[in-house]
């Protein structure tokens, strides 16, 4: 692993600025093992719970965006310092595979998919402004995927890029209709 003092310093500074105003830290869109390890190490000394979210390689729900194994990332992040594991800003299909890996760690886990056609065109420093939204994932599809993920044991559900408030509202209506209890996943 490459420990990056520059990256660690950035995460520590962010933690220092937020620690008095937050209940817990969410570390999102971790695309490599180094990135995740540096973030967890930097934030674990603030006496706050940590939810970490990994970004998956498009087309392979077992790999991070960097190409490294998701299971190896979970093994190396000091899992005892983590309160929950998620997959975010990734394709629905990849998340469905990756959740089976997260489940093995015995922590609350979840999914926050994006609704992009593809992020493969992205290069370092580019914005997602030019990425197109998928046309094949409607609100009811989001709800159906979420139901599958609930059956896998997910306790954290939400959305990332291009998952609009209408999608979240559709999910909320489904959860209420089916009498799912909202729980604080840190209890």
Q: Model-derived features: where do they sit?
A:
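An active-site-proximal structural segment forming one wall of the substrate-binding cleft
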Residues: 9-20, 24, 142, 149
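Active-site-adjacent beta->alpha loops and helix N-cap segments on the catalytic face
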Residues: 30-47, 91-106, 163-171
């Amino acid at each position: 692993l490459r420990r990056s003092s520059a990256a660690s310093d950035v995460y520590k500074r962010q933690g220092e600025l937020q620690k008095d105003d937050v209940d817990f830290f969410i570390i999102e869109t971790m695309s490599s093992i180094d990135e995740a390890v540096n973030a967890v190490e930097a934030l674990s000394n603030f006496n706050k719970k940590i939810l970490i979210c990994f970004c998956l390689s498009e087309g392979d729900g077992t790999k991070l965006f960097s190409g490294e194994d998701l299971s190896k990332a979970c093994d190396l992040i000091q899992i005892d310092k983590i309160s929950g594991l998620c997959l975010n800003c990734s394709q629905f299909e990849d998340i469905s595979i990756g959740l089976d890996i997260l489940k093995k760690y015995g922590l609350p886990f979840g999914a926050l998919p994006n609704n992009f056609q593809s992020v493969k065109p992205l290069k370092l420093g580019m914005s997602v402004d030019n990425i197109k939204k998928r046309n094949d994932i409607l609100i009811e599809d989001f709800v159906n995927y979420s139901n599958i993920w609930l059956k896998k044991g997910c306790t954290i559900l939400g959305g990332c890029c291009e998952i609009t408030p209408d999608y979240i509202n559709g999910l909320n209506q489904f959860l209420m209709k089916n009498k799912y209890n909202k729980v604080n996943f840190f209890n």
